[in-house]
A protein has these predicted regions:
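Bacterial Sec-dependent N-terminal signal peptides
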Residues: 1-37, 243, 294, 304-306
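Subset of outer-membrane beta-barrel
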Residues: 35-306
């Protein structure tokens, strides 16, 4: 019986590693970006999306798909796609993280492979988690979306810089109740302090949350308040504050207020802890209210080989 378990376990690890390798091979042809307006799912549903230290923190192969579109008919309004996959291998976490955003004529790319290590502190599920991602960053101007002088040499110069290697680093303390984390994204820009880099780029991210359990059985509710602090180049730093409500791990409700004077709301369902779907709506910032109608985001999470 022990022998069969080993075979099953080895087969599971092999399948998951093959899937991650396939995703890693494909991600270098995919487009993505670090963001001023992050996906709402990063706060609770998929924290690996923002912090590489969360890769492989939980059992199984976790696959997350996201799509976000601004609720507006304005030409060139932003749309975003994201996919992450992470897998736990003993104390090691492996993952791939791809984020794609197009706004107007600008398309940005960030595609990363992640290695994380989870150090147990005791038998009470307390861990110190460290993660690093490395991959490519690509930014291009789509000539078909340019309203202006197509021969402007600055456009060609911008496109000719091609893809650049970049990385993210994250750390987190996690337990059954308290989570504390910090992230330095876009390490290349952080180290080189490149003045030519455009605005709308993440500089840092930090967050703390605490889980509160109330009720038992069918009346059990887990409430997780969270505060986050983000730095974005060219903008004032942003505070996020809100909470997630988990009803018996079947129904989720969340809300976050952002100091940019916008708010995010989400609701979703979880089927047998293996398939979750959530929808999010984010109001526009104060600067855009009246000219746009906010954004809608749909997130799908599947947990395999658990």
């Amino acid at each position: 019986m022990k022998f069969n378990y080993k075979i099953d376990s080895q087969f599971k690890h092999t399948v998951c590693l093959l899937l991650l390798t396939t995703a890693l091979t494909a991600l270098f042809t995919t487009k993505a970006n670090a963001q001023l307006n992050p996906l709402s799912s990063q706060y609770f549903l998929n924290q690996y999306q923002i912090n590489p230290a969360y890769a492989g923190l939980t059992d199984g192969l976790n696959v997350n798909l996201n799509y976000r579109k601004q609720w507006s008919n304005i030409p060139g309004s932003p749309n975003t796609q994201s996919i992450t996959a992470d897998y736990k291998l003993n104390k090691v976490g492996l993952g791939v993280n791809v984020y794609n955003e197009k706004a107007g004529s600008l398309q940005r790319t960030k595609a990363m492979a992640t290695y994380a290590y989870h150090l147990p502190l005791n038998n009470d599920d307390q861990k110190l988690n460290f993660g690093a991602s490395i991959g490519i960053m690509n930014e291009r101007v789509d000539y078909s979306g340019v309203n202006g002088d197509m021969t402007d040499p600055s456009i060609a110069q911008f496109n000719n810089k091609g893809s650049l290697f970049d990385g993210d680093f994250g750390a987190a303390y996690t337990s059954k109740t308290l989570n504390v984390e910090g992230v330095i994204p876009n390490i290349r820009s952080f180290i080189k302090q490149e003045e030519e880099n455009d605005v709308d780029r993440s500089l840092f991210y930090a967050a703390v949350s605490y889980k509160i359990n109330t009720g038992t059985g069918a009346n059990a509710i887990e409430i997780e308040p969270k505060i986050a602090y983000r730095g974005i180049k060219g903008y004032d730093n942003i505070w996020d504050a809100g909470a997630n409500f988990n009803f018996t791990n079947k129904v989720f409700l969340m809300g976050m207020y952002h100091s940019s004077k916008s708010a995010s709301f989400g609701a979703g369902m979880n089927y047998k802890s293996s398939l979750a779907i959530m929808g999010f709506y984010t109001t526009e910032t104060s600067a855009l209210q009246g000219s746009a109608n906010g954004t809608f985001e749909i997130s799908l999470k599947a947990t395999l080989f658990k």
